[in-house]
């Protein structure tokens, strides 16, 4: 009986530790980093496709909208990054017709790498149905960053791809 209790306790510790949000200070600093992305970007995937992305700071500065125009043929996808109190979160509005919410669980001390992990979702009857489960943003400089997205289905990570992003030059007004 003691062994079973110990196993349950250890499992609970590891389960809850994985869902712990990043520190409030790093989350707030990180949100400012996402706000700095405002503008147009071009991305190249490790699978060879290209996409255009537009970042906008919206809702009186309370959210950052990431609009992907070409990641999925004929579909625009949307990701919203925001603070929920002291937690940094994102919601991904996917062509898979679900909306996973991911929590920033790890932010590097230098504030350049953000790992978001699955928290919950709408329109996802079971976690085993296909959805975006993890996202990692790595900021290189003010004009370059990468993202890695992980697809999860039937209890397994199905694929991971990285997208190299580069800020597009600002077009002069005519």
Which residue stretches match the model-derived regions?
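Sec-dependent N-terminal signal peptides
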Residues: 4-13
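Hydrophobic small-molecule pocket/channel-lining residues, especially in calycin-type beta-barrels
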Residues: 19-174
């Amino acid at each position: 009986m003691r062994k079973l209790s110990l196993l349950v306790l250890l499992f609970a510790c590891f389960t809850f530790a994985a869902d712990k949000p990043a520190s409030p200070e790093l989350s707030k600093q990180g949100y400012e980093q996402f706000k700095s992305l405002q503008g147009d970007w071009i991305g190249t995937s490790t699978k060879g496709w290209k996409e255009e992305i537009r970042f906008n700071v919206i809702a009186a500065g309370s959210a950052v909208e990431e609009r992907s125009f070409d990641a999925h043929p004929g579909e625009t996808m949307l990701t919203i990054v925001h603070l929920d109190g002291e937690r940094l979160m994102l919601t991904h509005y996917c062509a898979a017709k679900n909306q996973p919410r991911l929590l920033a669980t790890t932010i590097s001390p230098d504030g350049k790498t953000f790992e978001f992990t699955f928290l919950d979702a709408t329109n996802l009857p079971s976690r085993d149905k296909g959805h975006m489960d993890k996202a990692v943003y790595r900021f290189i400089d003010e004009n370059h960053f990468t993202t890695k997205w992980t697809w999860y289905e039937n209890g397994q990570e199905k694929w991971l791809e990285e997208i190299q992003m580069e800020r597009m030059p600002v077009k002069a007004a005519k």
